[in-house]
Amino acid sequence: MWVLASKTLSSVPFPFLYNPIPNRHSSSSKLKLNSSVKFEYETERGLDFETGESFFRHESATGRDLGVLAAALYKKSKARLRILDGLCGCGIRSLRYLVEAEADFVLANDANDDCRDVICRNLSKVPRGSDDEPRWTVTHTDANRVMTECYLQREFFDLIDIDSFGSDSSFLRPAINALRFDGLLYLTSTDGYSSGGHRPHHSLAAYGAYVRPLPYSNEIGLRMLIGGAVREASVLGLRVVPLFSYYSYHGPVFRVMLRVNRGKLSDNSHYSFVSYCHQCGNSQTFHGMNSVRLVAPVAMQSPLSSRGRFGQDLFTTPPILQKC
């Protein structure tokens, strides 16, 4: 992992897509004026946009910057860029992909259809293009359903951005399935409670990592997220390579950019244990599956002690304790 040092398309249309520009002559699409509706205007990197009632954080701008930078570099090297923004909020991330990364197409999805008018107004700053070759489309459904529909219709994407809340790992497999080979997967976790080791059984269920309290929980949170993606990809016979990771204390927010390709992991060095001693502060990493044989005998010979050393398997094994 580097901590910030960074299929074939078919012509079948999406059956679940809405018209991104409502019919102005339809009474159901007219803008309803309501005193309870807020129209908040913001500016990010020179782009003006509305937030409305959608969830938006100024502090997440750096994470969006990194996503746009990776997308722009991908477009420069591949000469194409199709993006799926699975949880787009007010649409500023999708707008920046269109304007700054010059994406050929962006599918902006958000499950909350109350945000539709705001998203469409923001994206309308970029000409939509023709019906045959649109630049952007807006949908309002579950992100997993959108990605699964795209996968079934062989509508693959070069970059999929999943800016999710908490530690919802259910997005991992649908996102990997809908991604083009050699594509980029931008994942998010905001579950600082689990990465801090306060819910080890929750992190085990979500990412296959049994996490205990450690002084470097920010790094563990990033590794936990990457490890979950590596495991899901390996089940599908795919290989994940981390390009960069980003941590921010607000939230907190863990973001990782991954490249997904054909081929399984060449060895078991990606499966490791991390140990930490609360007495002396020493930390150790045991690489490979042989670490089970290296650490387990010591644990069996020593009494379990909360003041001793514990080992954390980043995938499936409970903590292993030994005396410091």
PLM region spans:
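SAM-dependent transferase fold signal centered on methyltransferase-like domains
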Residues: 2-324
